A protein has these predicted regions:
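Bacterial N-terminal signal peptides that target proteins for export
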Residues: 2-17
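C-terminal segment of classical bacterial N-terminal signal peptides
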Residues: 19-28
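Second-shell loop/turn segments in exported
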Residues: 62-66
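Short amphipathic alpha-helical segments with coiled-coil-like heptad repeat character
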Residues: 2, 67-68, 99
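SH3-family beta-barrel domains
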Residues: 31-60, 71-75, 82-85, 89-97, ...
């Protein structure tokens, strides 16, 4: 009877060791994806969001007691989140200017900033497709889909595909719909 209990205990111990060893080999592979995640939201860092409000205070640190350095005054402006702390997100704009903004002022709606003057929107993701509209540099457009080298934009009642390389607010390898 003693030997039977010892065998069961040994088999259980062996199984537990195998599980621990497997986990130790699997975990580094997951960690090596190169994508950092926020400690608050567990979402990728950096990531793009947009201004939900038409005006938002940008603070030096993540609390109301920190000084306001400036005010973002453009609804739907794309911003890149670079850090998280409680209800605060450290963001930066296209020019690298930024600070801490309360999360309630931000939206997950994807927008981009046009970086090329008279950027043409095409009917299909093809440079030879019919041109639907042209957007001036600095225009903010909503993004509904991105794949490969093109993104589907909506702005001023127009809809069309634009080359991803001419936009700020999406990563080069990013795809979504």
């Amino acid at each position: 009877m003693y030997k039977t209990k010892l065998r069961k205990f040994g088999a259980g111990l062996l199984g537990a060791c195998a599980l621990i060893l497997t986990a130790s080999f699997v975990t580094p592979a997951i960690a090596d994806t190169g994508e950092e995640t926020g400690k608050v939201t567990n979402r990728p860092i950096p990531r793009f969001v947009s201004m939900k409000a038409s005006e938002g205070n940008v603070r030096r640190g993540p609390s109301l007691t920190h000084r306001i350095d400036w005010v973002f005054k453009r609804r739907d402006m794309p911003l890149r989140i670079t850090a998280e702390h409680g209800h605060w997100r450290r963001v930066e704009d296209r020019d690298g200017m930024g600070g801490w903004v309360h999360y309630s002022l931000l939206s997950g709606t994807r927008t981009v900033l046009v970086e090329k003057d008279m950027l043409t929107l095409h009917a299909r993701p093809d440079p030879n497709a019919p041109v639907m509209a042209a957007l001036e540099m600095g225009v903010v457009a909503r993004v509904s889909e991105c794949g490969g080298e093109w993104c589907l934009l909506r702005s001023g009642g127009f809809k069309g595909w634009a080359p991803k390389a001419r936009l700020w607010g999406v990563r080069p390898s990013e795809t979504f719909d």
